Structure formats: structure tokens, C-alpha cells
């Protein structure tokens, strides 16, 4: 199944790994932007981004999805399903209606 994954923290990264292990086609990953961490404020990628890049999956990090700026990009990815795990952004109705089989959202 062609899946668009959206998530950010460690728990989401573990879910993404499970989807890869199950043989699903992850067409792209959406995650929050890299942010400064620690005393030296080192710019650090979210765990989901690291997993996706290790698998050669395209990663997108928009500030928001609510303004519709990503609708065309998501439509072009043609996901059959969107899986959301602790993403941190609200998905607008325009995105929720795109995939053939809808969206699955896991709150943690």
C-alpha cells in the first residue's frame, strides 16, 4: 500500500520503522522542522526524518498544512493512505480527503 507518513518524535519513528519492515511503500514523510537542541543549540532533525532519510524516502518539513500550501504536493504523491503519529500539525479537510483509504491518526 502506498502510504504517506506524518510524525515527529521517537514513538512515531518506531511506527515508521514497523511500516517499512512490513513492506509498505512509504511515498514520503512529513515531519516538524529541525530545531535547536541542548546548551549549544545544535540544529537537530526529528527522529522520523532520520529514519526516512536512512530509507531514501523524501522528507517534507512545512511550517503548517492549514494554509493549503502542501495540498498539491500531497496530491501529486498519490497516497492511498495517510498514517499520522504524533505529528504536531492539524491536517485540514483538504488533506484528509485526498487518500483513497483515508487517514489513520494515533495520539500518544
Task: Give residue ranges: language-model regions.
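One-carbon transfer enzymes
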Residues: 1-108
Amino acid at each position: 500500500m502506498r502510504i504517506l507518513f506524518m510524525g515527529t518524535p521517537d514513538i512515531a519513528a518506531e511506527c515508521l520503522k514497523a511500516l517499512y519492515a512490513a513492506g509498505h511503500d512509504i511515498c514520503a514523510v512529513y515531519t516538524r522542522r529541525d530545531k535547536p537542541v541542548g546548551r549549544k543549540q545544535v540544529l537537530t532533525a526529528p527522529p522520523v526524518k532520520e529514519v526516512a532519510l536512512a530509507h531514501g524516502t523524501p522528507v517534507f518539513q512545512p511550517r503548517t498544512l492549514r494554509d493549503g500550501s502542501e495540498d498539491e504536493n500531497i496530491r501529486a504523491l498519490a497516497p492511498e493512505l495517510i498514517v499520522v503519529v504524533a505529528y504536531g500539525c492539524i491536517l485540514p479537510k483538504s488533506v484528509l480527503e485526498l487518500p483513497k483509504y483515508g487517514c489513520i491518526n494515533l495520539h500518544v
